[in-house]
């Protein structure tokens, strides 16, 4: 089994870029950024529970990474960079730390390296469980209205919140809930030590108004790029700034 994806071929010898979206996004999320890199092969993946992969069930990160590997092989992508946002960033970090074959570099935007104690994991398990129940049983417009009131999204304007709520409400609540539980921070290990031991380039992107993830970026051995005029979802709020950072990282 493989994940649904959109593939754009590039020029021979150019880097292959594999993009992983955030929770409730899909393969279109990274395209305004990725399509600025025409020379590179670009693979935009729908994670399980999302988009064209909505019906694919997973029990945890191991299943997600197994599906990711199968998808890369199906497209004959043997050497690549992973670029992931939020949930996609956490999947990318997990894959990197588990030694996914062919990975040449890692770019994470606003991805959490992991909680560091059992109390924090227990609290997150309860929180994600409550959100999952809401995704299963309540209208998605109501759930996402409240979702985007969380402190991490404080930099969004009312208009941006409204647009995101309308966009994300096109998802399937049941499959979102299942993926939220399967990949919760409550079940993700603390990756800091493993990330600090990576033998290939690791870059971290965060919005200048995203104080939480700017602080987390200092806890991993990554080169940090701060995206101006952006909060947690920097590639949506300032795509040109993220394009500039990726061009520097990839030396294009």
Curated annotation (Swiss-Prot):
Keyword Lyase carried by entry: yes
UniProt cross-references to Pfam families, sorted A to Z: Abhydrolase_6
Record GO terms (molecular function): 2-succinyl-6-hydroxy-2,4-cyclohexadiene-1-carboxylate synthase activity
Coiled coil residues, start to end: none
Uppermost EC category: lyase
Listed pathway(s): Quinol/quinone metabolism; 1,4-dihydroxy-2-naphthoate biosynthesis; 1,4-dihydroxy-2-naphthoate from chorismate: step 3/7; Quinol/quinone metabolism; menaquinone biosynthesis
GO biological process terms held by the UniProt record: menaquinone biosynthetic process
Catalytic activity entry: 5-enolpyruvoyl-6-hydroxy-2-succinyl-cyclohex-3-ene-1-carboxylate = (1R,6R)-6-hydroxy-2-succinyl-cyclohexa-2,4-diene-1-carboxylate + pyruvate
Keyword annotations from UniProtKB, A to Z: Lyase, Menaquinone biosynthesis
SUPFAM superfamilies with a match to the protein in the record: alpha/beta-Hydrolases
Function: Catalyzes a proton abstraction reaction that results in 2,5-elimination of pyruvate from 2-succinyl-5-enolpyruvyl-6-hydroxy-3-cyclohexene-1-carboxylate (SEPHCHC) and the formation of 2-succinyl-6-hydroxy-2,4-cyclohexadiene-1-carboxylate (SHCHC).
Family (UniProt): Belongs to the AB hydrolase superfamily. MenH family.
Assembly behavior: Monomer.
HAMAP family the UniProt entry points to: MenH
Protein name: 2-succinyl-6-hydroxy-2,4-cyclohexadiene-1-carboxylate synthase
Organism: Salmonella enteritidis PT4 (strain P125109)
């Amino acid at each position: 089994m493989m994940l649904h994806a959109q593939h754009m071929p590039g020029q021979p010898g150019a880097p292959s870029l594999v993009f992983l979206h955030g929770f409730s996004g899909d393969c279109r999320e990274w395209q305004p950024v990725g399509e600025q890199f025409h020379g590179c092969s670009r693979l935009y993946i729908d994670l399980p529970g999302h988009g064209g992969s909505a019906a694919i069930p997973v029990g945890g990160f191991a299943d997600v990474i197994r599906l990711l590997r199968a998808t890369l092989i199906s497209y004959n992508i043997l050497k690549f960079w992973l670029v992931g946002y939020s949930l996609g960033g956490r999947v990318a970090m997990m894959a990197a730390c588990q030694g996914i074959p062919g990975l040449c570099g890692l770019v994470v935007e606003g991805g959490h390296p992991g909680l560091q104690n059992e109390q924090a994991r227990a609290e997150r398990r309860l929180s994600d469980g409550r959100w999952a129940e809401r995704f299963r049983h309540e209208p998605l417009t109501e759930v996402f209205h409240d979702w985007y009131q969380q402190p991490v999204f404080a930099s969004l304007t009312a208009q941006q919140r409204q647009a995101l709520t309308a966009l994300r409400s096109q998802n399937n609540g049941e499959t979102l809930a299942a993926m939220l539980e399967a990949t919760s921070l409550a079940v993700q290990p603390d990756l800091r030590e493993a990330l600090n031991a990576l033998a290939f380039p690791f870059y971290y992107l965060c919005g200048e108004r995203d104080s939480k993830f700017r602080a987390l970026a200092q806890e991993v051995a990554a080169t940090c790029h701060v995206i101006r005029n952006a909060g947690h979802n920097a590639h949506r709020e300032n795509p040109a700034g993220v394009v500039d950072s990726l061009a520097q990282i990839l030396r294009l």
